[in-house]
Structures are given as structure tokens and as C-alpha cells.
């Protein structure tokens, strides 16, 4: 244990000298003065001493002259001469002694600057060589280690710090040599030098437990630990088991380990699905740490475009979409002994498809164990779907939560959120606050306004630390939500609904729930997806309230009346684009998708729209069976239109450029970012990728971004300068690498044609020809095949530029208007050339010059003639084969 001594003025020292004295720590158990004192003495002190000596000499000479003048009156001349001689000799002797003293002081001053004073024993022993000093210190360090006593990490750190401030050689029981100075101490705290990681690492390794050991010990304190034996018995007796356990009970991390310890991995792997890729990665990392193995060996994960597993892997975490893709290769899941579908209450699109598929697999594989894990009490529905499966409830670690309601909804709930945060901060006990908001825009708005409100309050209250968390936030900033707030402050976490179940933030005592979330909704009639702000369900409200009762009693402030909410959220399968689902089912040999065993059947018009789109893309034939093109498309873990674009690039000799564009589109809209205080510079940097003789469009601009980044050797600094998110670019590179490998797998020739922009645009159109629009007189656009008015998205490089007459777009989104996102200019005759089965001349007729019309007609005629010749040749071939 060490007691640190603060800075304190030393009596008799000049002011400038006092300001530089520092003291290192000293052991509390002894009454000795500090054994090692470090201080700095300015060089001008020696000059000041010399000046004082000269003044003393002058005063002494004046005094002597006065005395001589008085004595001259009474003494004879001989006596005066003799006395003068004696006085002169005495004066010279004293002066010589003073000079020697001054020189000694000057040398002492030089030695004391930036130096240390050793104890008397060191001076008496003489100079001890460097090796001997370190040997003495090392012996003292190893002495405690040999004693066999277990030392905690904190004690090891304290001992190491004390050793740095303690005398390591010479006699420790002697007072330090400091001539002529008196020190005054008080009880305040001083400072010791900060340890570097390299210095303290070895001590930490010797004295403290590893992170893996701590993680293993923490397993015993989870709520699920007491139910281990009972749980294993139920899994052995029941092929299908529905487990209900609150978030934080340990079901996700512990059940796979219990099964491994019980010997289930001898018959195959244990697979556990997660609805989000971030959850799959973080949980796998935690379990690998608890098991004590390297991530990717015995414990691994698999997410889209990333596989961190090996032949040794026996516990595998994955997204539900990845297990769905494994079913394409291994329909009976023969390599698995247990399948755990975790977070089943979220009812994602892939989860609902998995329910039906694993239900069928369990019927043909009696040895397979199927566990459905949920954090809500919707277990009865799961049990009924799986033929009255057994339900097992694991109690959570919950404290009482006081719920406060608003009688009527607030018109401006963001302002109410800010007022509630300030109210809690000023009136409630210490504890962190968790606020649920719908997305990044709302989080940034509340963060800005809350900071302004706290500045207006000034020093009336303690400080708050605002920690936002959303998907596009850089990882280091996301990690701040898990750091405890400094003493005397309060942390305010602004989060999306990811904090409902996927994240556990300790220290939260208050929850503010406005009662809204964003859900993705697809309109099959228009083919448009919209991210809508909608009220949450009662199940979600219960999850949010539970976040405040994990470490102690909490409060939940609800800005709504819970009676107005629906019991559960609408499953994603009833509000999503089903094209990829139908293509997957067709590739599995399931022809009748309308009578498929869905837990909640999707709308029929959504299934019809998906079948029509797949037929237009060439993935299905006239009777609804998958084609060779469809078999190649299903190999790519992307949207069917995107996969058709990749497959179609082979014809236009630009497959390398197209997979780059596909990878950039797959990372979403998180490539560019616009800081609030640098929006003009960010927009200018983004438009640099569009500059050309003509505006190239968003797809080509994304290609240029990736190629420029590659030329800069994948530089993070370059991304910062261009206002590009390096995290998104690295993910795009990983996606591109996997797409490149899949191209080789399906036998597509790798070609490059970077200078032929028309060829690249045609390849894009090969997959996205249903997404075409033409310019109207009022500046808006009209979809070619649908009577719908759409607009260029403000984030597009074509927004505000000279309008192009014809565009192809990546997707439609509904915000304030129906916007086309990621647009590129095209020529109308390409529609007839690429998709004559989908477009007719009347679809693209307008007031164009006759030459353009003639080119379109010629392209259409030549395409029809080619198709006729192809059909005729096929008929002739069939006749010859029959003969």
C-alpha cells in the first residue's frame, strides 16, 4: 500500500524553486521520510548566491574603513601598519574559504538539477555498478513470487508502482541526505510516474488472473447456471425444446457450452443462429474466451461475406441467413447434432423460413436436437408450431422497475425526451439513462439539443456524458457506451432498438421510451421499400423497461399509454420483398410456395410479385422451375437483381468492375459521411468522383471510389481526407473478395473493361432493367412500367445536375417523397436490346427525334430476328435428334 505526498512549499526556499518540487510515493507502514526525492533547482540560484556574497564583502569593507578611521586617531603609525597586515591576512583567509564554499555550492547546484539523491549507505559504499543495482531490485521482486502467495491484479500494480518510488539499493532505514533544508509535509496525495504497458505487463501476468479465467469464473454467477443439469436432461428427453430466458440470463453463451461438456459435439457441431451479424461475432468471441481457445478454432462464427471457422470448429455461431444457405448444400444438416435458433422472438425473414425447414429436417433426423430460444413470453406460439413442444422458463436477474406513463401521446416527443433527461438528472439519484430513439437522425438531433440545454444550465448540476450508438457509428465510439461513467457524472446513452435485446449496458437505472421504432416495409404493388416510424409492440415495451432493472431497482418513463399498443410486432415475412426467399425455396426443390408451412403466411400478392420478378430475370421458367441462370444466381448471397447483374456482366466483358460495384452497393449507404461542421467540404470531396465530360452517375462513382482507394494502397488517411468511411470500404473489399471467389466457382470468366462505360452500364441494366424511369416535363421522373412518379435522391450525384432523360436506379425508398437511390444515366434502346421480353416499343415511345426512334426500332427488329433464328435452330436440332 502506498501513500502519496503532495507538492508543498519548503520554508526558506525562493518561490520559483518551490514550484518545481515533486515527491514520489512512500510506504504508509513506516515513519521514514521519503527515501527518494526528486527536485529541480534553477541555475540562476547560484548567480543569486554570488550576488549576495559581493554585497556582503562591500558592506564589510565599509565597516572596516569606519573602524580604521577611528583607531587611527589613538594608535601610532607602526601599530596601525601591523594591525592592517594582520587584518589583511585574516581577510584573505576568510575570502579564500568563502570562495571554496561558493564553488562547492555551485557544483552542488549543478548536481541537483534533474537528479536524485541517494541515501547515506550508497555514499558510504561508493559507486555500485549498474548490474548490481538491478540484481538487488530483481531479487526483491522475485522474493514475493517465491513465497507462493496469490496476489491480485490490483495489489500487483500497487506493488509495482511502490517499487518505482522506493529505494532499491543501499540502506533503506537511513534518512536521506539533504543539507540545510527543512521539509514540511501534509496529508494530501502526490503523484507517481505512469506505468507503460510493457513495464507492467509481466507483473500483471505473474500476479493476476487472465481475462479467460475471469470469464470462466463469471459463468457461475449467471442465472442459467443453477439450471444446468435440469436443462440438459430436458434436451436429452425432448427433440424440440422452447426455452424462454430474459436477455442477460446466459442462454446464448452457456447452452452451447453445456452441450459440448455433455458430449453432444461427438456426434456433430452445435450451431447457434443470431438475427444480427454483430451479435454473432461478439458472442462467438466471448464463448471462445470462456472456453479458452482461439476464435476460429473450436469456437467460430459465420456471417455474410465472412467465415471465421475451421475443421476443428464444434461450436458455430452464425446469422440465420447463413444457416439457410448451408441448407442449400446440406439439406439434412448432417454435420450438426444440435441447432439453436436464438432470439426467435425477432421473427426476421430468414428466421421464419428456418422454422419451417428445420421442422422438416427434425422429422427425418430423430437424433437432431432443436432448441428455440426466445427472450419474450411468445413461447406458446412457438410450441404450437413445433407440435406442442416442451417449454422451459429460465428466470432472469431482474429488480423491480417502476413504470411511469403519459396519459396522452406527446406531439413533439424529441423535446419531451430532452426535458425528461434534464428532469431525471436534476431530481433523481445517481444512475445512467438509456433513451430509445428511431435512428441516427433523431439521435444526432437529441444529442445536439441536449448539449445546448446543459450548457444553459451551467454549473447548476453535475456533468452528463452523452454516448450515442447506431449502426453507422465508428466502432471506437460505439465502445464508449460500455465504459462506466467517471465519478460524479452521469452517462446518457442514445440508442436505437438494438439496445432492446442485442446489447447489455450495465449501470442503466433509468429508461426513457418514446414508444417508436423504424421498420422496413415493402409494397409489392409499387416494388418500393420504405423505412417507416411506427409504434412499438407491448413485447418491445416490456423489453425496453427491463433494461433499467438489471443491476438494481430502476424506473421507466414511457411517453405513451401502453394500452394503445399491439401485442407483438408484425413479422418481417409479411412486410418484406420475398424474391430472395422464393429463389431459395425453389433451389431447395420446393415448388408450391403458396402452401409452404409458414408460421405466419405472407401476403399472396407479395409471393406473386416475387415470382414475376424472378421470371423476368430469367431465374425461373414458364412453369416456375429454377433455370440454369437461377442456379448461378442463388450462389451469390445478395439480392436477386444484384446477382443477375453479376451473372450478366460476363456478356459485356466487365465482370471485375461489376463485382466492385456490387460490393459497394452491398455496404448500403454508409460509404460517404457528412460531418455537421464540414458539410460543404464533404459534398465537394464526393462530387470529385463524378467530374467528367458528363455526369457518370452513382454506380460509376462508387467504382471510382474503390479504385482510387486501391491505388492509395487502401489508406485510412485517404478515406478521412475524402470523407469516406474506412470501415465501410474494408467491408466492401471483403465482400468483393468473396464475390470474386464465387465467380470462379460458377465458371464466370474474369474480365475487365474499365474504359467502356457503356458496357458497364449495360451490365448494370441487365440486372436492374425493371428499375427504369424517364424524365417528365416538370423535372420529376416516371417509372417506365408503372404509373408512378419518382424523384432523384438528394444524396445522388445526379441531384441538382442537368437532368438525364432516362435513368436506371438501384432501389426506391419512401421518406418525404418517393426517391430513387443510386441512379445512372442510360439509353432507351438498351431496354429493348437487353430485355425485349419485358419492354415493348410503346413503353419507351416519346417525342424523341425520328433518328432515335429508328435506332430503337432497328434494335428491336434485330433482337426479334435473332430470337426467331435461335428458336428455328433449336427446332431443327430436335428434329435431327429424333431422326
From Swiss-Prot:
One of its GO terms (molecular function) is RNA helicase activity. Residues 232-395 form the Helicase ATP-binding domain. The keyword Hydrolase applies. A motif (DEAH box) lies at residues 342-345. Predominantly expressed in flowers. Residues 845-883 are annotated as: Disordered. It catalyses: ATP + H2O = ADP + phosphate + H(+). Its EC number is 3.6.4.13. ATP binds at residues 245-252. Pfam families: DEAD (PF00270), HA2_C (PF21010), HA2_N (PF04408), Helicase_C (PF00271), OB_NTP_bind (PF07717). Belongs to the DEAD box helicase family. DEAH subfamily. PRP2 sub-subfamily. May be involved in pre-mRNA splicing. This is Probable pre-mRNA-splicing factor ATP-dependent RNA helicase DEAH8.
Amino acid at each position: 500500500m502506498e501513500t502519496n505526498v503532495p507538492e508543498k512549499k519548503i520554508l526558506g526556499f525562493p518561490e520559483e524553486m518551490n514550484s518545481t518540487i515533486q515527491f514520489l510515493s512512500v510506504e504508509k507502514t513506516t515513519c521514514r521520510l521519503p527515501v527518494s526525492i526528486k527536485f529541480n533547482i534553477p541555475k540562476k540560484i547560484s548567480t543569486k548566491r554570488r550576488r549576495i556574497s559581493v554585497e556582503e564583502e562591500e558592506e564589510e569593507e565599509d565597516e572596516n574603513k569606519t573602524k580604521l578611521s577611528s583607531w587611527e586617531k589613538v594608535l601610532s603609525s607602526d601599530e596601525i601598519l601591523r594591525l592592517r597586515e594582520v587584518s589583511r591576512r585574516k581577510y584573505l583567509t576568510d575570502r579564500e574559504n568563502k570562495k571554496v564554499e561558493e564553488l562547492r555550492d555551485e557544483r552542488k547546484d549543478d548536481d541537483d538539477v534533474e537528479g536524485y539523491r541517494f541515501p547515506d549507505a550508497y555514499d558510504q559504499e561508493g559507486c555500485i555498478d549498474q548490474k548490481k543495482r538491478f540484481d538487488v531490485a530483481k531479487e526483491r521482486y522475485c522474493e514475493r513470487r517465491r513465497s507462493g502467495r496469490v496476489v491480485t491484479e490490483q495489489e500487483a500494480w500497487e506493488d509495482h508502482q511502490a517499487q518505482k518510488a522506493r529505494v532499491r539499493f543501499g540502506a533503506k532505514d537511513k534518512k536521506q541526505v539533504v543539507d540545510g533544508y527543512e521539509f514540511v509535509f501534509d496529508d494530501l496525495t502526490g503523484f507517481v510516474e505512469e506505468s507503460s504497458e510493457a513495464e507492467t505487463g509481466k507483473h500483471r501476468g505473474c500476479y493476476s488472473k487472465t481475462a479467460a479465467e475471469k470469464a470462466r469464473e463469471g459463468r457461475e454467477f449467471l442465472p442459467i447456471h443453477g439450471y444446468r443439469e435440469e436443462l440438459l436432461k430436458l434436451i436429452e428427453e425432448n427433440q424440440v425444446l422452447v426455452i424462454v430466458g430474459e436477455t442477460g440470463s446466459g442462454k446464448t453463451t452457456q447452452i452451447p457450452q453445456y452441450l459440448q461438456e455433455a458430449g453432444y459435439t461427438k456426434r456433430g457441431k452445435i450451431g447457434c443462429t443470431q438475427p444480427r451479424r454483430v451479435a454473432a461475432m461478439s458472442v462467438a468471441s466471448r464463448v471462445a474466451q470462456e472456453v479458452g481457445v482461439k476464435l476460429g478454432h473450436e469456437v467460430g462464427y459465420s456471417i455474410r461475406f465472412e467465415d471465421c471457422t475451421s475443421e476443428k470448429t464444434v461450436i458455430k455461431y452464425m446469422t440465420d441467413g447463413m444457416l439457410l444457405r448451408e441448407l442449400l448444400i446440406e439439406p439434412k444438416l448432417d454435420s450438426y447434432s444440435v441447432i439453436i435458433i436464438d432470439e426467435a422472438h425477432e421473427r426476421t425473414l430468414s428466421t421464419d423460413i428456418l422454422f419451417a425447414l428445420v421442422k422438416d429436417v427434425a422429422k427425418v433426423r430423430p437424433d437432431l436436437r432443436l432448441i428455440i430460444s426466445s427472450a419474450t413470453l411468445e413461447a406458446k406460439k412457438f410450441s404450437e408450431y413445433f407440435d406442442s413442444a416442451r417449454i422451459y422458463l429460465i428466470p432472469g436477474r431482474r429488480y423491480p422497475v417502476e413504470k411511469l406513463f403519459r396519459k396522452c401521446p406527446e406531439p413533439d416527443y424529441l423535446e419531451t425526451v430532452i426535458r425528461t433527461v434534464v428532469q431525471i438528472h436534476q431530481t433523481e439519484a445517481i444512475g445512467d439513462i438509456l433513451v430509445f430513439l428511431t435512428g441516427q437522425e433523431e439521435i444526432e438531433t437529441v444529442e445536439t439539443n441536449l448539449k445546448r440545454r446543459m450548457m444553459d444550465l451551467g454549473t447548476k448540476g453535475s456533468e452528463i456524458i452523452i454516448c450515442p450508438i447506431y449502426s453507422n457509428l465508428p466502432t471506437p465510439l460505439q465502445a464508449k457506451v460500455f465504459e462506466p461513467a467517471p465519478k460524479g457524472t452521469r452517462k446518457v446513452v442514445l440508442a436505437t432498438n438494438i439496445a432492446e435485446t442485442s446489447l447489455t449496458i450495465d449501470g442503466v437505472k433509468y429508461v426513457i421510451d418514446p414508444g417508436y421504432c423504424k421498420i422496413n416495409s415493402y409494397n409489392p404493388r409499387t416494388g418500393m421499400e420504405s423505412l417507416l416510424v411506427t409504434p412499438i409492440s407491448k413485447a418491445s415495451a416490456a423489453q425496453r423497461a427491463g433494461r433499467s432493472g438489471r443491476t438494481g431497482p430502476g424506473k421507466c418513463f414511457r411517453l405513451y399509454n401502453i394500452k394503445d399498443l399491439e401485442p407483438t410486432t408484425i413479422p418481417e415475412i409479411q412486410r418484406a420483398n420475398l424474391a430472395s426467399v422464393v429463389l431459395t425455396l425453389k433451389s431447395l426443390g420446393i415448388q408450391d410456395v403458396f402452401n409452404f408451412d409458414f408460421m405466419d403466411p405472407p401476403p399472396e400478392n407479395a409471393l406473386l410479385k416475387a415470382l414475376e420478378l424472378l421470371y423476368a430475370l430469367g431465374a425461373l421458367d414458364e412453369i416456375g422451375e429454377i433455370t440454369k441462370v437461377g442456379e448461378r444466381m442463388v450462389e451469390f448471397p445478395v439480392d436477386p437483381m444484384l446477382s443477375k447483374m453479376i451473372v450478366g456482366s460476363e456478356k459485356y466483358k466487365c465482370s471485375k468492375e461489376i463485382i466492385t460495384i456490387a460490393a459497394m452497393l452491398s455496404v448500403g449507404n454508409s460509404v460517404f459521411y457528412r460531418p455537421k461542421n464540414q458539410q460543404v467540404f464533404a459534398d465537394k470531396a464526393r462530387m470529385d468522383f463524378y467530374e467528367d465530360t458528363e455526369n457518370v452517375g452513382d454506380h460509376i462513382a462508387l467504382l471510382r471510389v474503390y479504385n482510387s482507394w486501391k491505388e492509395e494502397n487502401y489508406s485510412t488517411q485517404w478515406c478521412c481526407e475524402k470523407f469516406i468511411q474506412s470501415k465501410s470500404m474494408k467491408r466492401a473489399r471483403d465482400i468483393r473478395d468473396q464475390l470474386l471467389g464465387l465467380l470462379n466457382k460458377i465458371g464466370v470468366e474474369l474480365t475487365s473493361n474499365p474504359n467502356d462505360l457503356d458496357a458497364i452500364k449495360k451490365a448494370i441494366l441487365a440486372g436492374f432493367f425493371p428499375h427504369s424511369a424517364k424524365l417528365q416535363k416538370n423535372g420529376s421522373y416516371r417509372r417506365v412500367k408503372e404509373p408512378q412518379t419518382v424523384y432523384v435522391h438528394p444524396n445522388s450525384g445526379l441531384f441538382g445536375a442537368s437532368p438525364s432523360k432516362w435513368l436506371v436506379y438501384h432501389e426506391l425508398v419512401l421518406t418525404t417523397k418517393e426517391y430513387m437511390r443510386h441512379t445512372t444515366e442510360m439509353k432507351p434502346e438498351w431496354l429493348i436490346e437487353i430485355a425485349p421480353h419485358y419492354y415493348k416499343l410503346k413503353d419507351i415511345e416519346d417525342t424523341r427525334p425520328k433518328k432515335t426512334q429508328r435506332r430503337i426500332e432497328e434494335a428491336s427488329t434485330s433482337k426479334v430476328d435473332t430470337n426467331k433464328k435461335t428458336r428455328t435452330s433449336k427446332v431443327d436440332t430436335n428434329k435431327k435428334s429424333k431422326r
